[in-house]
Amino acid sequence: MNAPVFNLDNVMMPAEFRHCFDAQRKAYLAHHEPSHAERSADLQSLARLLKENRDALVAAINLDYGNRSEFETLFTEYFVSLEAIHDAGKNLKRWMKPQKRRVDQMTYPGARNRVIPQPLGVVGVIVPWNFPLNLSFTPLAAILAAGNRAMVKMSENSRHLAALLASLSPKYLPEDKLKFFDDGGGRGPAFSSLPFDHLLFTGSGQTGRAVMANAARNLTPVTLELGGKSPAIVAADFPLEAAAERI
């Protein structure tokens, strides 16, 4: 079955998307190579958002799920996100250093070559409902460490978490650096049609094809993580109430 390719000429662009993108693009062009100290401070702010709002984040995810094990949220999302931020901070200096590359001296005698890491600009992230904290903050750790700015669109099935993050994030990072969006439904095509410098998507293959087609209109590079189901097997002799709570 082929995925639908949206006609972007007829897509209504929410004003908040365009306004935020323009603000982040302007901020990036005015200050396109943040220092190690600035990037480190951004990562610390991201970690503080998680640490200072742990209970509220867990509660919001539980509301979106209807009922979700606190243990699962903490160990598959919360601690994983903190570890990603910590790892980025620990490796940041090394990641920012220029890297030497070999040059064929027969072809280019006396030449030297090196790769200088540079920020891309404004990065978009489309987050699914199943692991909404992990799949927003883990990429954000890399995005901010690389000196970029980010717009994050949450799933329409993560309304409570999206609203919470949208209200919390400006207290830790300015909106021209990071902004979360709630998806009231049907806004994905508009988001993926923005001229990002890179776009990350996690979800189904069918939706991934549509996202890639939209991004192609702007020659936006994309990273697609395309998945399926996460089955759980409950043995006949295991207590059903305990299984339901943990799953």
Each model region followed by its residue ranges:
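Residue-level signal for inorganic ion chemistry
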Residues: R39, I85, G147, L178, ...
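Hydrophobic packing residues within well-ordered alpha-helices of enzyme cores
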Residues: A162-L165, F191, V211
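Conserved small-residue-rich beta-alpha loop and adjacent elements
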Residues: D104-Y172, L219, E241
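N-terminal Rossmann-like NAD(P)+-binding subdomain of aldehyde/semialdehyde dehydrogenases
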Residues: M1-N113
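A structured beta-alpha segment of the ubiquitous adenosine-cofactor-binding alpha/beta core
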Residues: R112-N113, K179-D197
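ALDH superfamily catalytic-core signature
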Residues: V11-M13, Q206-I247
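Short beta->alpha connector loops at strand-helix junctions that form conserved
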Residues: N148, K153-S155, D182, T202-G203, ...
